[in-house]
UniProtKB/Swiss-Prot annotation:
It comes from Homo sapiens (Human). Residues 950-978, 1138-1181 are annotated as: Disordered. GO terms for cellular component: cell surface; external side of plasma membrane; integrin complex; plasma membrane. The keyword Transmembrane applies. Residues 950-961 have a biased composition (Basic and acidic residues). This is Integrin alpha-7. Gene3D superfamilies: Bicelle-embedded integrin alpha(iib) transmembrane segment, Integrin alpha, N-terminal, Integrin domains. Chain A, domain 2, ntegrin, alpha v. Chain A, domain 3, ntegrin, alpha v. Chain A, domain 4. Keywords: ADP-ribosylation, Calcium, Cell adhesion, Cell shape, Cleavage on pair of basic residues, Congenital muscular dystrophy, Disulfide bond, Glycoprotein, Integrin, Membrane, Metal-binding, Receptor, Repeat, Signal, Transmembrane, Transmembrane helix. The gene is ITGA7.
Length: 1181
């Protein structure tokens, strides 16, 4: 088959042009004036229930006398006498008049032969078409029955259908018109053949009026067919009687396999019946399961396609100047199809192109039309699919427009026009002809169930069809429901050379809409003077400036012979753009009506005929003290056609002519600009300013005229604003108007007229006022009601080289704890020539918690000495080492923390050195303050993990003493090392800090629920003496660092703490008394002892030589009595040490025993015995 279908013919149809009710309402006021006359519509009514309007056609009779007829089919009209039926249908002809009920029934189909036929419900008038002016008419009854063997057992009734062809005067002349046409009569009957032919469901004439086209969708089991027969117009056509007929299945072959339609919708159905009849209306349909289907070849897949449901023709569809026929099959392949056919032989129509539908059950091909929409010489194809729907986009009904590509149809992506849901958009189509006289045919689309029904008018163009409807006719406007079910156009019924439109309905009513002639108006606005010089008053009296305006009109129309007198009403509106901005106009019209506003003037001009030029004058005066001297004064001319009053026509009078209308595609307005003579704008008289916002930064207000810039973030572009109760904040702004290039100052930097700075504030800031360092530079700033939008006048004009600096005072009352950023949008504005862009001033808002932390250690110096003890040997805290106490104080100078979050005081306690040995042993942690009612200051984790005994009595006593008054016993006792380390071998100092990795810390965290003033954390600990003796005995000094900080847990992201940490150092030394013993090398001591012994020996020898040891003789005396006392072993050692002169102390942590057996030796007189040095001597054994 020629013209194969493309793989994706719907590739470009995704865009659906839907014009629903809302759009119709928006456009109706404009569309009603273009160009079908709704107000003067002619209404025709038929018998109730007759379906008068089911089909319609426009017809013009030329012989024997000119007459225009509205042909209306009424397929349910009552039967005529003699037809022996109740309802047979009929064709009605309505004259062009104002009467609504003056239609008469065309006299056809008289009588009935009940032995051969039945006319009951034959639906005469189901279709009606006219050849045009002076042409024939065809109307059909597709349910007409042919009968055989009436009242016999083998009686048959075949719904073959039939058509009537009438002459132009609505009479039947059998010798020329053929009278009754029944091509299915006499053919094989039954629904598989021609028993349900239903000829005349669609009928049409070829554009050359040579052929008559019939659609018979019921043939071949509703596969359908199309038939083309010669339609003789006169004796000249008698020579071509052998031309046809042509049929899709073959006139002679009558072969259903030749029917060119795709697969059908009902393959696989089983007929189940217990009635002895072949009438398919009495069959019950059942779908067979796959297992129940009989094996064998597949059945005919083209049944029930309804080929011939719509039919038309055109020349040039496939080949230039060659006539082709188009038939619709709306149920083919469940989607519908349209087939383009050509004559192949004396009896066959051969398919050339097949176009398939897009969606299932869309009814593609239900209606169709052929028209050259783009006037390229190749007719295009319009196809209706009224059952199309799109659920997501809420579309219902579609019309596809295929633009002929030089006879090639493969790969064409049609334009899809859509209607509203359930509207049946596309059930009827009509070619209107050139409705607007632009050289391109127009079409009409019916949507009878869109509200009360609508008809959409689409204009053709060089690109095809304009997707936006130019006019929408509504059934509601004429009081008809199901309006638009049938359409007919392309004929001029009233003689004004514009085609008209006849619309039918299912409400027994038809309406004719006549097209209005279109006027093309030319207009011109003249202005004097062209420029306004404010220094040259020219009004009467010489005090003001005036401007004269003149407007002139003329028109042309199609046809050139149409030349009525028309009246145009015009309005001149000054300062239109300024008023749209809400500003006061600068002019006043002097020649205006009193009821008109001062910025408007109106008038009327009468144009007697085409090309007649008529003018009107007006004058306006410029107001005094005009500020806007740069923007031009815009004068807008608008005009409209004065509509004549409708006069009531008396019965019997002819139709009044329709009033003309202005071309809707031609603008009916014109703008003219009147400029001011510009000063300070350079030689070109174009003010090219260079306004620049060189500074926009947030500041803290120190005084009324003193501001301090806020600190900037690390990016250098965002200020940091601390929310600490300050009521206002300043925004420093500096604006300049300097040339962008000093080397070319004439390029820009001209005066900036009406220079403004527009400030848009966030909800958290509100305008409060403006300040300037120089009062002369203070701009005028005005804000709106809620102080969120500020306009500052910078000058009118802001001169070349000017610079202004000022501060906006902004209230911070709207800033809350949720506010994280302040962004103020700034935009410079001027009516001078300059492209300006908005800029933003930003500040990051943070909430600074007024918490401070400080710490101290008591004492700040610790000493170590003694002996090394293991961890298991520790029983009490006194066994560990020197005690130390830390106090960390947190102060709150602001609001309660409860409103912001949860705060924690953390202390990093260095409990180990890097190798894991104890450093500072935590004994006790207590928090004083910082708690709410009923809350305890519990810190975690718990200290004293070795559970050493706490000497609470001794602790309380020592805490009350200042550090310098502590007992010597609290100092470290030197170790009993007799191998002291020299000072030269000692290192300088070591720092033990967790932050440096030289120590390991445990973090004690204490919650601060709520406090107003201060909270104090007390931490007691002990210096682990053994670690220092083992690791740092050769170190001169050690610095132990304890760190503390405050953390806050809060959902507020912009909290910030300053001074939220502290460092508490403690110096640790080897005990200074241990340094005396251990600071001298051993060999020095040995030499000193030997030297001392030598000196002693020499001294004794010298004294002996001198007789020092010889005593004088004394008289004998009574020798006193002594008591023997046992001296403890440890005291003996002390006595020995005192004799040698070496001073030693007890080991640290080993107190001196003072028992009852350690007492001095008493002499006989009860007093202590004195030693050689004059002091009491120790007891002796």
């Amino acid at each position: 088959m020629a013209g194969a279908r493309s793989r994706d013919p719907w590739g470009a149809s995704g865009i659906c042009y839907l014009f629903g009710s809302l759009l119709v309402e928006l456009l109706f006021s404009r569309a009603v004036a273009f160009n079908l006359d709704v107000m003067g519509a002619l209404r025709k009514e038929g018998e109730p229930g007759s379906l008068f309007g089911f089909s319609v056609a426009l017809h013009r009779q030329l012989q024997p006398r000119p007459q225009s007829w509205l042909l209306v089919g009424a397929p349910q009209a009552l039967a005529l006498p003699g037809q022996q039926a109740n309802r047979t249908g009929g064709l009605f002809a309505c004259p062009l008049s104002l009467e609504e009920t003056d239609c008469y029934r065309v006299d056809i189909d008289q009588g009935a032969d009940m032995q051969k036929e039945s006319k009951e419900n034959q639906w005469l008038g189901v279709s009606v078409r006219s050849q045009g002016p002076g042409g024939k008419i065809v109307t059909c009854a597709h349910r007409y029955e042919a009968r055989q063997r009436v009242d016999q057992i083998l009686e048959t009734r075949d719904m073959i259908g039939r058509c009537f062809v009438l002459s132009q005067d609505l009479a039947i002349r059998d010798e020329l018109d053929g009278g009754e046409w029944k091509f299915c009569e006499g053919r094989p009957q039954g629904h598989e053949q021609f028993g349900f032919c239903q000829q005349g469901t669609a009928a049409a004439f070829s554009p050359d009026s040579h052929y008559l086209l019939f659609g018979a969708p019921g043939t071949y089991n509703w596969k359908g067919t199309a038939r083309v027969e010669l339609c003789a117009q006169g004796s000249a056509d008698l020579a071509h009687l052998d031309d046809g007929p042509y049929e899709a299945g073959g006139e002679k072959e009558q072969d259903p396999r030749l029917i060119p339609v795709p697969a059908n919708s009902y393959f696989g159905l089983l007929f189940v019946t217990n009635i002895d009849s072949s009438d398919p209306d009495q069959l019950v349909y059942k779908t067979l399961d796959p297992a129940d289907r009989l094996p064998g070849p597949a059945g005919d897949l083209a049944l029930n396609s309804y080929l011939g449901f719509s039919i038309d023709s055109g020349k040039g569809l496939v080949r230039a100047e060659e006539l082709s026929f188009v038939a619709g099959a709306p149920r083919a392949n469940h989607k519908g199809a349209v087939v383009i056919l050509r004559k192949d032989s004396a009896s066959r129509l051969v398919p050339e192109v097949m176009l398939s539908g897009e969606r299932l059950t869309s009814g593609f091909g239900y209606s169709l039309a052929v028209a050259d929409l783009n006037s390229d010489g190749w007719p295009d194809l319009i196809v209706g699919a009224p059952y199309f729907f799109e659920r997501q986009e809420e579309l219902g009904g579609a019309v596809y427009v295929y633009l002929n590509q030089g006879g090639h149809w493969a790969g064409i992506s049609p334009l899809r026009l859509c209607g509203s849901p359930d509207s049946m958009f596309g059930i009827s189509l009509a070619v209107l002809g050139d409705l607007n006289q632009d050289g391109f045919p127009d079409i009409a689309v019916g949507a009878p169930f869109d509200g009360d029904g609508k008809v959409f008018i689409y204009h053709g163009s060089s690109l095809g069809v304009v997707a936006k409807p130019s006019q929408v006719l509504e059934g509601e406007a004429v009081g008809i429901k199901s309006f638009g079910y049938s359409l007919s156009g392309s004929l001029d019924m009233d003689g004004n050379q514009y085609p008209d439109l006849l619309v039918g309905s299912l409400a027994d009513t038809a309406v004719l809409f006549r097209a209005r002639p279109i006027l093309h108006v030319s207009h011109e606005v003249s202005i004097a003077p062209r420029s306004i010089d404010l220094e040259q008053p020219n009004c009467a009296g010489g005090h003001s400036v005036c401007v004269d305006l003149r407007v002139c009109f003329s028109y042309i129309a199609v046809p050139s012979s149409y030349s009525p007198t028309v009246a145009l009403d015009y309005v001149l509106d000054a300062d239109t753009d300024r008023r749209l901005r809400g500003q006061v106009p600068r002019v006043t019209f002097l020649s205006r009506n009193l009821e008109e506003p001062k910025h408007q003037a109106s008038g009327t001009v009468w144009l007697k005929h085409q090309h007649d030029r008529v003018c009107g004058d007006a004058m306006f005066q410029l107001q005094e003290n005009v500020k806007d001297k740069l923007r031009a004064i815009v004068v807008t001319l608008s005009y409209s056609l004065q509509t004549p009053r409708l006069r009531r026509q008396a019965p019997g009078q002819g139709l009044p002519p329709v009033a003309p209308i202005l071309n809707a595609h031609q603008p009916s307005t014109q703008r003219a600009e009147i400029h001011f003579l510009k000063q300070g704008c350079g030689e070109d008289k174009i003010c090219q300013s260079n306004l620049q916002l060189v500074r926009a930064r947030f500041c803290t207000r120190v005084s009324d005229t003193e501001f301090q810039p806020l600190p900037m973030d690390v990016d250098g572009t965002t200020a940091l604003f601390a929310l600490s109760g300050q009521p206002v904040i300043g925004l420093e702004l500096m604006v300049t108007n300097l040339p962008s290039d000093p080397a070319q100052p004439q390029a820009d930097g001209d005066d900036a007229h009406e220079a403004q700075l527009l400030v848009m504030l966030p909800d958290s800031l509100h305008y409060s006022g403006v300040r300037a360092l120089d009062p002369a530079e203070k701009p005028l700033c005005l804000s709106n009601e809620n102080a969120s939008h500020v306009e500052c006048e910078l000058g009118n004009p802001m001169k070349r080289g000017a610079q202004v600096t000022f501060y906006l005072i902004l209230s911070t009352s709207g800033i809350s704890i949720e506010t994280t950023e302040l962004e103020v949008e700034l935009l410079l504005a001027t009516i001078s020539e300059q492209e300006l862009h908005p800029v933003s001033a930003r500040a990051r808002v943070f909430i600074e918690l007024p918490l401070s932390i400080a710490g101290m250690a008591i004492p700040q110096q610790l000493f170590f000495s003694g002996v090394v003890r293991g961890e298991r040997a520790m029983q009490s805290e006194r066994d560990v080492g020197s005690k130390v106490k830390y106090e960390v104080t947190v102060s709150n100078q602001g609001q309660s923390l409860r409103t912001l979050g949860s705060a924690f005081l953390n202390i990093m306690w260095p409990h180990e050195i890097a190798n894991g040995k104890w450093l500072l042993y935590p004994m006790q942690v207590e928090l004083e303050g910082g708690q709410g009612p009923g809350q305890k200051g519990l810190c975690s984790p718990r200290p004293n993990i070795l559970h050493l005994d706490v000497d609470s009595r001794d602790r309380r006593r020592r805490e009350l003493e200042p550090p310098e008054q502590q007992e010597p016993g609290e100092r470290q006792e030197p170790s009993m090392s007799w191998w002291p380390v020299s000072s030269a071998e000692k290192k300088k100092n070591i720092t033990l800090d967790c932050a440096r990795g030289t120590a390991n810390c445990v973090v004690f965290s204490c919650p601060l629920y709520s406090f107003d003033r201060a909270a104090v954390l007390h931490v007691w600990g002990r210096l682990w003496n053994s670690t220092f003796l083992e690791e740092y005995s050769a170190v001169k000094s050690l610095e132990v660092i304890v760190r503390a900080n405050i953390t806050v847990k809060s959902s507020i992201k912009n909290l910030m703490l300053r001074d939220a940490s502290t460092v508490i150092p403690v110096m640790v030394y080897l005990d200074p008394m241990a340094v005396v013993a251990e600071g001298v090398p051993w060999w020095v001591i040995l030499l000193a002892v030997l030297a001392g012994l030598l000196v002693l020996a020499l001294l004794v020898l010298l004294l002996w030589k001198m007789g020092f040891f010889k005593r004088a003789k004394h008289p004998e005396a009574t020798v006193p009595q002594y008591h023997a006392v046992k001296i403890p072993r440890e005291d003996r050692q002390q006595f020995k040490e005192e004799k040698t002169g070496t001073i030693l102390r007890n080991n640290w942590g080993s107190p001196r025993r003072e028992g009852p057996d350690a007492h001095p030796i008493l002499a006989a007189d009860g007093h202590p015995e004195l030693g050689p040095d004059g002091h009491p001597g120790p007891g002796t054994a």
